[in-house]
Amino acid sequence: MSNINAKTGKQFIIIIDEWDVLIRDEAAEFEVQDEYINFLRGLFKGTEPMKYIGLAYITGILPIKKLKTQSALNNFDEYTMLDAGELAGYIGFTQDEVKTLCTEYGADFEKVKHWYDGYRLGDYHIYNPKAVVSVVTKRLFQSYWSQTGSYETIIPLISKNFDGLKNAIIEMLSGDMVKVDTGTFQNDAVNFSNRDDIITYLIHLGYLAYDEKCKCAYIPNEEVRQELLKATRQKKWKEFIEFEKQSDNLLDSTLDMDNKKVSEIIEKIHMEYASVIKYNDENSLSSVLTIAYLSSMKYYFTPIRELPAGRGFADFVYLPKPEYTDFYPALVIELKWNKNVRTALEQIKQKQYPKSLLSYTGDILIVGIIYDKKDKVHKCEIERYEK
């Protein structure tokens, strides 16, 4: 290229699609990867390539691999799922584009949004184009993920024995966000040193979304949630399978208005998933509720947070999905400490009616759960709400 440029005076435009195939598919072949990275560095690094390359455009799932803490090709501008910059509106379909398609094809936008929205890049809500096109043409609300990627690739990742990884996955499956430090990830599929590296990789793969403002990861939508659930039900995730049974029992007991059983299960989950240090921390209250009611995600939307944690309570509203409104009531659940269980229920009633339920016409259960900070005993009382 240098010789051609010297003779013609013309520069090259180089386009490489899926630059990271060797990084992902040959993850254990370190010599192959080193040779490949050195080839790219020879092609793009230094002042000489600037003479004969007018533009280089490289696409892939992963950012450019790091050598120690620096990018192997630091003369590129990178746009990623962590920071899409000015390209944010071009990485997928924007919400306005999806609304237009829904109008054109007569699809229910709110349902499309629930299933396929969730990625936040800059000021944009970004949707997976493959999923949107499939749902508006086929009229089937389901996961189209398996047609563009395999969940089997993440089973070894989420099965790694990093402290806090499995709990973080369960929290996100329950609808919560988890804090993540994306800075240590080496941008490859091998050098994972902690749970944050795994979570960052899953963000780049699209299985998780990233909130840049609060530095948190979360599951973006129902489609991706379905795929992650498939992965967590594999044999290596025996702990999750057991936990899911426990959560199933909790939801059934709540719907049966079995106060004693709900108290026992919540207490057990609180003991298992809140460390001794954080057991009485206000912020752990929300995690206890969302984790405990993980199984509700089959029939309910992601829980709506009505009140902030930090004052000794956590308040959530669970609305059933449209296809389940005839069979499942809405749930208003409040967890408080050092209070009388009747007080918890009365406060739910006395508060201004939750905004998220104003237009809801189905049955409603209000669930008051309290625990004592000293003896850690939980109590529960459930009532059917009369409008």
Regions from the PLM with identified roles:
Residues M1-D281:
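Phosphate-binding site recognition
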Residues N3-T8, M297-D326:
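Active-site metal-binding core of divalent-cation-utilizing nuclease and nuclease-like domains
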Residues L22-R24, K65-S71, V341-A344, K374-E381:
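Switch/connector loops and helix/strand junctions flanking conserved nucleotide-binding motifs
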Residues Q33-F39, W337-P354:
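Mg2+/Mn2+-dependent nuclease catalytic core
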Residues G42-M50, T200-L208, T290-S295, Q347-V367:
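Metal-dependent nuclease catalytic cores in nucleic-acid-processing enzymes
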Residues M271-P303:
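Acidic-basic catalytic patches of nuclease active cores, encompassing PD-(D/E)XK
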Residues L289, A314-Y318, Y328-K339, K351:
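Conserved catalytic cores of phosphodiester-cleaving nucleases, focusing on short active-site segments
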Residues S356, G362-K387:
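Domain-level recognition of nuclease-like catalytic cores that cleave nucleotide substrates
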